[in-house]
Amino acid sequence: MALSLAISPCPNDTFVFDALVHGRVPGAPPVEVTYADVDVTNTAAERGAFDLVKVSYAALPWLLEDYHLLPCGGALGRGCGPLVLTRGDRTDLSGATVAVPGERTTAYLLFRLWAADQAPARIEVVPFHEIMPGVAAGRYDAGLVIHEARFTYPRHGLTALVDLGEWWEGDSGLPIPLGAILARRGAVDPVEATAWIRESVRQAWADPEASREYVLAHAQEMEPDVVDRHIGLYVNEFTADLGEAGFAAVEALLGRAADAGLVPQTSSSRATAWTS
């Protein structure tokens, strides 16, 4: 029986999951894939819609009752945080209309922690690919962006008001937890799922060209050099194993957010994960 998998079409996800999706991981079952923005997968996971699913770490407090957090396959690192973009030389967001990619995304959670002493007039949830054009056209005063936008935003005539990754790393000393891989309880063994994903990651690193056509086919018109930079930044040591620093980052982010009343209190992410 095929497992249902939901990931984004972003190059880091398709690179990581190429071998698993295409049946090259020994012992793994067939996989049926859905590609969607993380705001969509966050919502779908609340309904238990997928066996394996990529979600925002910010959504974990609402999901861990039904899902295991896997210690691999996700997006966590340094120098890869969300950016707040504007058209001009704005120095704060007081009274601004800000476009964000989702209310339960890690990007928006980091934004709320950073902007605690500011008061944007309005927050609008906007599909990720519409944020930069919308800010450039003046529909929004600022936009919160992730992933490949850090490489391409100057083309839209935009400037970075703040790099939330730099802010988080400087404030906490920890890497930035962005996207997690979850396994639905009762549907898939988390130990087996972890082994499959780690083997898929191993194959991706061993032969990057094997996934090239698949990655580019889903890369939303990204140039090959941007795709390569994207993969190089977001697929890293934490993709293979969250490790001590990775789990510490997740626990620090969710703990700080819970203390601020932004997410429900939850047990340690380590206690709800399968780890080797």
Regions found by a protein language model. Name each.
Residues S4, D66-G74, T97-V98:
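A structural signal for short loop-to-beta-strand junctions that line the ligand-binding cleft
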Residues L69-R90, W168-R185:
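Hydrophobic/proline-rich hinge and linker segments of small-molecule sensing/allosteric domains
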